[in-house]
């Protein structure tokens, strides 16, 4: 959170506004303080209060206003900030609430969204976006000398954001596939991508060939072949899956079913915030993904819990 305030100070200097020691710096906060996302809004405010204590600057005053996770309410609150003479605002949290903020041109908004498509000129995205993550993945591919990478992108509302990140990072890849997250369709799609049917048939054909051969060791050869699921390799050495949670697990499980294992192919995904449920799935390991510093995350979580007696949502870390 200290980094966030550093950005604000840079923005303050860039606007050529002079502050004396007695001048109070007013910073607005747009967060969902009511409605179904109110608990997240509360966590964001608590995180900002912790940051203020850490930076020990009594000249900063925070003014929170409710967005109710609604674009119209967000605009009304932003216009109230404008009347107060506030020019810098943390928030809003969600991309949908940025819709009308180009009408408040006197304010710079440091939004917590990780989406960067079609942002208004007065909005800065401070979330962990796809471009920054893909740049990190690109370095990993280069240092690991991984040559043939495929992208698996779900047909969801952020697929254009991912494709923009791929273009900006100039990451080299072999092929790119979109897939339907519907479990009844997913496995068939992964089978096609991995040529599972051909590789499975290759195995059956080889078993049949050996059975009909005069090889004196054919029983042993057949025994070894029957331990396999497929015969023949896939045309890639790494998979980047731009998915999360249960949907991500379903994709990796489908890859395992088609005899593509993390033990012989690199399975790479986006930041999973150290998802414990994912880490506990031993058959899905190893998985590679970019992340924030684990030690810093643990320190933030412990500090937050000690002060407020509950664990924070990781989105509040960005504030």
For the regions a protein language model found, what residue spans apply to each?
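Extracytoplasmic "Venus flytrap"
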Residues: 28-46, 65
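Glycine-rich, charge-decorated loop segments at or immediately adjacent to ligand/cofactor-binding or catalytic sites
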Residues: 120-124, 185-189, 273-285
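Signal peptide-proximal N-terminal region
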Residues: 45-66
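Extracytoplasmic ligand/sensor domains, especially the bilobed periplasmic-binding protein
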Residues: 88-152, 156-171
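Short, well-structured alpha-helical segments in soluble
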Residues: 71-87, 139-140, 189-198, 202, ...
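Classical Sec-dependent N-terminal signal peptides that target proteins to the secretory pathway
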Residues: 1-20, 30
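Extracellular/periplasmic periplasmic-binding protein-like sensory domains
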Residues: 171, 194-219, 234, 238, ...
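Short beta->alpha junction loops
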Residues: 63-73, 77, 127-128, 176-184
């Amino acid at each position: 959170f200290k980094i966030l305030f550093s950005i604000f100070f840079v923005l303050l200097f860039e606007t050529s506004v002079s502050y004396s020691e007695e001048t109070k710096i007013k910073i607005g906060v747009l967060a969902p303080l009511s409605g179904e996302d109110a608990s997240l809004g509360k966590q964001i405010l608590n995180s900002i209060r912790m940051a203020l204590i850490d930076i020990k600057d009594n000249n900063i005053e925070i003014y929170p206003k409710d967005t109710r996770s609604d674009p119209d309410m967000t605009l009304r609150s932003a216009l109230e900030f404008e009347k107060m003479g506030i020019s810098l605002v943390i928030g809003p949290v969600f991309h949908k609430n940025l819709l009308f903020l180009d009408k408040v041109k006197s304010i710079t908004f440091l939004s917590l969204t990780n989406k960067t498509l079609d942002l208004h000129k007065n909005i800065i995205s401070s979330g962990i976006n796809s471009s920054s993550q893909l740049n990190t993945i690109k370095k990993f591919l280069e240092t690991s000398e991984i040559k043939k990478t495929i992208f698996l992108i779900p047909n969801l509302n952020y697929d254009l954001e991912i494709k923009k990140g791929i273009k900006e990072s100039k990451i080299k890849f072999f092929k790119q596939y979109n897939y339907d997250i519907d479990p009844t369709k997913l496995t068939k799609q992964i089978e096609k991508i991995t040529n599972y049917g051909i590789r499975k048939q290759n195995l059956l054909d080889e078993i049949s060939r050996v059975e009909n051969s005069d090889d004196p060791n054919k029983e042993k050869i057949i025994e070894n072949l029957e331990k396999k699921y497929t015969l023949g390799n896939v045309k890639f050495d790494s998979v980047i899956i731009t998915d999360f949670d249960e949907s991500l697990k379903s994709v990796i499980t489908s890859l395992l079913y088609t005899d593509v294992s993390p033990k012989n192919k690199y399975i790479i995904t986006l930041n999973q915030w150290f998802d414990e449920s994912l880490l506990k799935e031993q058959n899905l390991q190893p998985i590679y993904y970019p992340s924030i510093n684990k030690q810093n995350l643990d320190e933030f979580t412990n500090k937050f819990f000690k002060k407020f007696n509950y664990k924070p949502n990781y989105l509040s870390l960005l504030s």
